[in-house]
């Protein structure tokens, strides 16, 4: 996922690499690439009734106007340092923040992550359990433009008592 993110970048204001519900282990991270190519983790499970993507909305107490003022202030500080110092880290963080701003301000991204927008019958067809809702959200994100989506769903890799294990799940 990180290689895809590095080579192709984001599309339609969506992160290039997304992990549902979270990054499962260090092998799903950015490896030797910059952390800016690491996956975007939802921070919540789409199978939960109160599912909400962790960092998709503005924090409580921050409206659009306050958000814009903060962004302008950060831009001024970054401009000051980048013109007076050799600040590669400022440039790198600036691109990271730009992607975050694009995600937060994109209605299309919010719709893609909002599994409640999906038809109830379709949600039922996928199954209202971890596997079904994670797969459904992955499909929505790919259709909206995410380049690489991975999801975690454990408990199916059985080595003993396979028949009974599958019946139980």
Model-derived segments and their meaning:
Residues 1-169:
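Ligand-binding pockets and gating/stacking loops
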């Amino acid at each position: 996922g990180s290689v895809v993110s590095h080579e192709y970048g984001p599309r339609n204001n969506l992160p290039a690499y997304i992990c549902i519900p979270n990054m499962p282990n260090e092998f799903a991270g950015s490896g030797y690439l910059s952390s800016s190519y690491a996956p975007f983790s939802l921070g919540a499970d789409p199978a939960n009734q109160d599912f909400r993507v962790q960092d998709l909305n503005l924090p409580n107490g921050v409206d659009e106007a306050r958000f814009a003022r903060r962004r302008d202030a950060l831009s001024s500080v970054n401009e000051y340092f980048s013109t007076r110092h050799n600040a590669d880290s400022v440039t790198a963080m600036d691109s990271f923040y730009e992607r975050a701003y694009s995600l937060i301000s994109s209605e299309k991204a919010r719709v893609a992550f909002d599994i409640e927008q999906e038809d109830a019958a379709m949600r039922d067809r996928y199954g209202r359990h971890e596997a079904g809702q994670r797969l459904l959200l992955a499909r929505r994100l790919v259709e909206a433009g995410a380049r690489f989506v991975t999801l975690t769903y454990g408990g199916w890799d059985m080595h003993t008592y396979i028949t009974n294990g599958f019946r139980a799940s």
